[in-house]
Amino acid sequence: MKLLSFGEVLWDIYPDKKCLGGAPLNFAAHFVKAGGEADIITAVGNDSLGAETLEGIRRLGVGTGCVAEVNAPTGRCLVTLDENSVPTYDLLSGVAYDMIPPPKDCGDFDVLYFGTLALRSGENLCTVRRLLERCDGKTVFVDMNIRPPFYTSETVRFALSNADIVKLSDEELPTVFETVFGRECPVAEDAAARLADGFGGCKLMIVTRGGNGAFAYDCRGKEFYRCGAVKAEVVSTVGAGDSFGAVFLHSYLSGRGVADCLAAASIAAARVVACAEAVPQ
């Protein structure tokens, strides 16, 4: 099965190193590790980091045929980790991934992925609209990936209204709920159900809860599925949500039940948090 992953590819700059990242790339790489195929739709700059980015994407097994080169610096993000290894991101604006043009030919595919961060630019919003026109009969997976201040009511609603499957964290859920409904968020499961039922195309809403596991709401059957977290010694949570979503999606498209998909995704996320890399080799 083939994934098209749209959005930011950037370098996470730590005090002592730099790592290639961005949720769409991490997601695509984990989808490939799960047994699928993936191409990334993004843009890099005509600079040394741009060339390094292309090499890094290919090493992860992700296709680069839909990567554009634009007249802007390759994306960067300054990252710090707190005492619990939770990352804080300082995302630079006006970078290459803010200027992603529609690919001329992205070939056949089964599923499109995007998140809200790359929608911070009007150009990218137009590109996603064009991609969605090619998604008749395809699955659309949205990772909300809320990064203040890079979201608006328009982009949140746009993402939710075009998604078959939505993934977000329990930390993002109140922000998304209050952005959509303009009132305080109820308990997590009620909030997820109201959000999902409020957008007719949504089939599944997945909420990750860190050390408390995850749950999924099946909008068609009005049923909740829950899964506890797999125990792991946490080194870094960077990439854990991406691995969770990618493995869930691959399992789901392979015909597995929602409960089994949650279990497989939880195992994958536990492996990632035990490593320093967002995509462990």
Each PLM stretch: what is its role?
Residues 111, 116-190, 212-213:
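Conserved beta-alpha-beta core of the PfkB/ribokinase-like small-molecule kinase fold
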